[in-house]
């Protein structure tokens, strides 16, 4: 299999943030923040080697260590994990990212990342507002975040990305724009601005408020040289895009290792036509994940058929400002994208919210504001055509 992305999930946290639904554990199963945890690291590396061998993966093109809170790992564990991942690589990993909370940043930790070959930091700032941090269960502070950014700026020579969230409890329009402006003033290379996700439906007024926050701050970022290349991601002068995340959005293969880590391996013929896909997700039980002798049992596999894969290509691809590559789509699915959702594309093009180019189909800046509505229309048309377009069923599995 060609080079692939690798995602590593570190499930440890000191406390659970109120808005977070990622799998994590706090000080149990033998975990203590900043202490060595060699058994956990070795188990991760065993699974990395196993997947790489089983699927004949040539190399890791990108690596992303997320969580949870990877910055709670002991510096020695970071060195061991990074070295094990890079073992056998003929070329360095092109992009090697680790997530961190600002309050965990210190010189020794940064040195361990550099020595391990990690070349990109993703810092979960979320907000500089101390009141908003407190009400949302974050353990950091404005002062600690500023100290962390100053430390990184003086000691880190790789890429830097920072996350902010729009719609946090207690947040105002002014506090978010102040947060965005502060990152701009630091000239952070890459900024992610996410709308708050909630398991429970938000009131329409709250949804509208979050949408307006995103619109206003997207404009602020654009005015300061940040190019929006994905609905929630901005690259300064378009030189600092996340290579790993583009694997997700372009529906390319990646492996997920660790409890709750998800990965998708895609099988195509020599011409790029989709054959099958397998999705693995680590079990959400750190105890069983650590002790199971049969490693296939902790990464149950789901087979993704062509219909579902096509839907996912649409869901992910239209998040990108460049949209979906038409020739690549046609190679994968045996027909141009207009054969599947042509009516939706033409309708949205008439509204000037979509562009149908020779090589790409994409939403305009205005269209991206209504991404969810567009996807509902597109999937509805896809479902209709799968049932009976032009008087006969469309063979999506052919």
Where are the model-predicted features located?
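Minor-groove-contacting beta-hairpin "wing" of winged helix-turn-helix DNA-binding domains
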Residues: 360-364
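A short, conserved structural fragment
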Residues: 349-359
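Short, amphipathic alpha-helical interaction segments positioned at domain boundaries
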Residues: 366-398
């Amino acid at each position: 299999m060609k080079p692939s992305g690798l995602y590593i999930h570190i499930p440890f946290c000191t406390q659970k943030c109120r808005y977070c639904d990622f799998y994590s554990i706090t000080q149990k199963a033998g975990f203590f923040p900043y202490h060595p945890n060699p058994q956990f690291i070795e188990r991760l590396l065993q699974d990395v080697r196993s997947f790489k061998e089983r699927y004949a993966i040539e190399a890791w093109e990108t690596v992303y260590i997320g969580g949870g809170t990877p910055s709670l790992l002991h510096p020695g564990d970071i060195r061991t994990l990074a070295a094990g991942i890079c073992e056998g690589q003929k070329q360095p990993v092109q992009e090697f990212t680790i997530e961190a909370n600002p309050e965990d940043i210190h010189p020794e930790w940064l040195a361990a990342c550099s020595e391990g070959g990690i070349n990109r930091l993703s810092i979960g700032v979320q907000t500089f507002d101390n009141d908003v941090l407190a009400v949302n269960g974050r353990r950091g502070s404005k002062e600690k975040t500023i100290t962390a950014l100053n430390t990184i700026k003086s000691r880190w020579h790789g890429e830097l990305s920072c996350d902010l969230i729009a719609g946090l409890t207690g947040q105002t329009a002014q506090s978010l724009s102040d947060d965005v402006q502060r990152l701009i003033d630091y000239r952070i290379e890459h900024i992610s601005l996410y709308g708050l996700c909630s398991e429970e439906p938000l009131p329409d007024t709250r949804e509208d408020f979050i949408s307006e926050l995103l619109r206003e701050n997207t404009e602020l970022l654009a005015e300061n040289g940040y190019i929006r290349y994905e609905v929630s991601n901005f690259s300064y002068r378009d030189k600092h895009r996340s290579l790993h995340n583009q694997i997700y959005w372009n529906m390319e293969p990646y492996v997920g290792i660790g409890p709750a880590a998800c990965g998708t391996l895609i099988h195509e013929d020599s011409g790029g036509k989709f054959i099958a896909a397998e999705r693995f997700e680590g079990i959400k039980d750190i105890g069983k994940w650590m002790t199971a002798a049969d490693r296939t049992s902790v990464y149950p596999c789901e087979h993704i058929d062509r219909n579902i894969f096509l839907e996912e290509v649409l869901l992910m691809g239209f998040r990108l400002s460049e949209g979906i590559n038409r020739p690549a789509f046609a190679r994968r699915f045996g027909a141009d994208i207009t054969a599947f959702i042509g009516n939706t594309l033409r309708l949205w093009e008439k509204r000037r919210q979509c562009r149908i180019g020779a090589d790409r189909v994409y939403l305009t800046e205005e269209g991206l504001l209504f991404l969810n509505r567009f996807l509902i229309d597109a999937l509805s048309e896809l479902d209709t055509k799968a049932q009976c377009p032009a008087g006969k069923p469309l063979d999506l599995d052919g």
